[in-house]
């Protein structure tokens, strides 16, 4: 064989070898491609994966796994960053898997952070403004008292709205016991309420002031004492005697009751003089509405029941002897009978019973008062044919009602009529 033939043979062998190596390499690359399924599969080190797979990485072991996305998982997968084949081929096999870069998500996140920062800054500013303007109840009360002191001594129409607003705020604040005492300690009775109740010509202001008075005295023994010491009892009695305004009478009754309830000394001093006469004058007035008259008999009934309750409890409580002694002095029977309480109630019910037919709550108030004061008025009421007619008319109307409350009131009236007239069989009108 010549040398030329040997060279040709060796060249052919080399070419064939290269082709085999290239084919093997291509086969290896194909077998090394990641084929995704619906199950999790381990990703080999350096192994490329197609886009759009669900990828998870164990941060402790470094194990990477991937699978096809479910429909509910679209848009949540980790994906390799290169978009084109050239970029993927040039990518280092050892470089970690990257998230898709989504400028819109990043910009949105930045925008939200800035908005939150702005909102927080605005919140801090608003809070500082709130702190600057914040006032405790005590500070508000002192401020309102000072505001009243700065009003003109002569009544000005331009100040009326401001005065009413001040009184409305005080009525709300003084329901609390401590606030009421702070108002009193800072001169509120002398500088605000007393001048209005005694001297002011505005009915609206007097009504508002008496509401404030009732608010601060209700269930507040220390405040009741201060109000009593300022002689508000007599001033309220005068208003009840002379006023014909429905709102003013209602407000005066509220303040009057707040002063007297659970305060036997005030009851003795006020009711033994002008107080009882003032209440009965309200009952006798043809210009006063029935609801206000119901408030009068309710107050009288409450005070009579209060005395009875205290005396009953004190019998078994030696420590209550001083309280009992104060209530023993209360002679409601003579205070009520002398100015004509029994006759006044008789007249109200006899003349206005038709109005009671549609006011069961008012009927109950009168029925309770009749029961409470029955002992001192039996001789008058049992002989009154007008009263009997009125009570039986209302009772019969309510007895035929389908309303449960009216039925209960009718039963109360039936028992009352039986005791007063002792003729249960007579139900004719």
Swiss-Prot record:
Segments carrying the region annotation (Disordered) are: 70-98
Q: Tell me where it mainly resides.
A: endoplasmic reticulum
Compositional bias (Polar residues): 75-84
- Gene3D superfamilies recorded: Leucine-rich Repeat Variant (1.25.10.10)
Query: Where does the protein end up?
Result: Endoplasmic reticulum lumen
Report keywords, A-Z. Coiled coil, Endoplasmic reticulum, Glycoprotein, Protein transport, Signal, Translocation, Transport
Q: Which GO terms describe its cellular component?
A: endomembrane system; endoplasmic reticulum; endoplasmic reticulum lumen
Q: What are the boundaries of the signal sequence? A: 1-24
Q: Name one GO biological process term.
A: SRP-dependent cotranslational protein targeting to membrane, translocation
Glycosylated sites: 29, 150, 199, 400
InterPro entries linked? ARM-like, ARM-type_fold, Hsp70_NEF-Inhibitors
Motif placement: Prevents secretion from ER? 426-429
- Give the top-rank taxon of the lineage listed in the UniProt record for this protein: Eukaryota
SUPFAM superfamilies of this UniProt entry?
ARM repeat (SSF48371)
**Compositional bias ranges of the Basic and acidic residues kind:** 85-94
Q: Name one GO molecular function term.
A: adenyl-nucleotide exchange factor activity
Coiled-coil annotated spans? 104-135
Q: Which family does it belong to?
A: Belongs to the SIL1 family.
Q: What does this protein do?
A: Required for protein translocation and folding in the endoplasmic reticulum (ER). Functions as a nucleotide exchange factor for an ER lumenal chaperone of HSP70 family.
This chain's protein is named Nucleotide exchange factor Sil1
Q: Which organism is it from?
A: Drosophila melanogaster (Fruit fly)
């Amino acid at each position: 064989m010549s040398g030329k033939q040997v060279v040709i043979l060796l060249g052919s062998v080399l070419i064939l070898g290269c082709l085999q190596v290239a084919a093997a390499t291509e086969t290896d690359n194909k077998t090394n491609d990641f084929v995704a399924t619906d199950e999790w599969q381990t990703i080999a080190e350096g192994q490329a994966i197609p886009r759009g797979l669900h990828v998870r990485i164990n941060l402790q072991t470094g194990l990477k796994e991937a699978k096809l996305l479910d429909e509910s998982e679209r848009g949540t997968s980790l994906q390799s960053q290169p978009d084109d084949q050239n970029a993927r081929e040039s990518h280092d096999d050892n470089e970690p898997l990257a998230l898709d870069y989504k400028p819109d998500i990043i910009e949105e996140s930045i925008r939200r952070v800035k908005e939150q920062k702005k909102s927080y800054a605005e919140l801090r500013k608003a809070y500082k403004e709130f702190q600057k303007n914040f006032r405790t109840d005590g500070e508000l009360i002192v401020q309102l008292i000072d505001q009243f002191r700065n009003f003109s001594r002569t009544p000005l129409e331009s100040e009326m709205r401001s005065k009413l607003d001040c009184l409305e705020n005080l009525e709300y604040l003084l329901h609390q016991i401590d606030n009421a005492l702070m108002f009193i300690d800072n001169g509120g009775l002398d500088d605000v309420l007393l001048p209005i109740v005694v001297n002011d010509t505005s009915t609206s202001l007097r009504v508002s002031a008496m509401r404030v008075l009732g608010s601060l005295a209700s269930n507040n023994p220390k405040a009741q004492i201060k109000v009593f010491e300022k002689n508000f009892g007599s001033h309220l009695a005068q208003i009840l005697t002379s006023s014909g305004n429905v709102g003013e009478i209602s407000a005066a009754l509220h303040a009057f009751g707040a002063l007297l309830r659970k305060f036997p000394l005030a009851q003795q001093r006020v009711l033994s003089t002008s107080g009882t006469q003032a209440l009965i004058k309200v009952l006798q007035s043809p210009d006063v509405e029935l609801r206000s008259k119901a408030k009068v008999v309710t107050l009288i009934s409450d005070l009579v029941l209060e005395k009875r309750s205290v005396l009953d409890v004190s019998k078994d409580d030696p420590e209550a002897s001083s309280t009992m002694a104060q209530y023993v002095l209360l002679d409601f029977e003579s205070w009520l009978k002398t100015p004509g309480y029994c006759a006044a109630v008789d007249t109200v019910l006899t003349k206005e019973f038709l109005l009671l037919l549609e006011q069961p709550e008012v009927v109950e108030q009168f029925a309770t008062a009749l029961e409470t004061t029955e002992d001192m008025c039996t001789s008058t009421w049992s002989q009154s044919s007008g009263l009997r007619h009125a009570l039986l008319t209302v009772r019969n109307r309510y007895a035929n009602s389908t309303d449960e409350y009216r039925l209960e009131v009718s039963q109360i009236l039936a028992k009352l009529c039986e005791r007063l007239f002792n003729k249960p069989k007579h139900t004719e009108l």
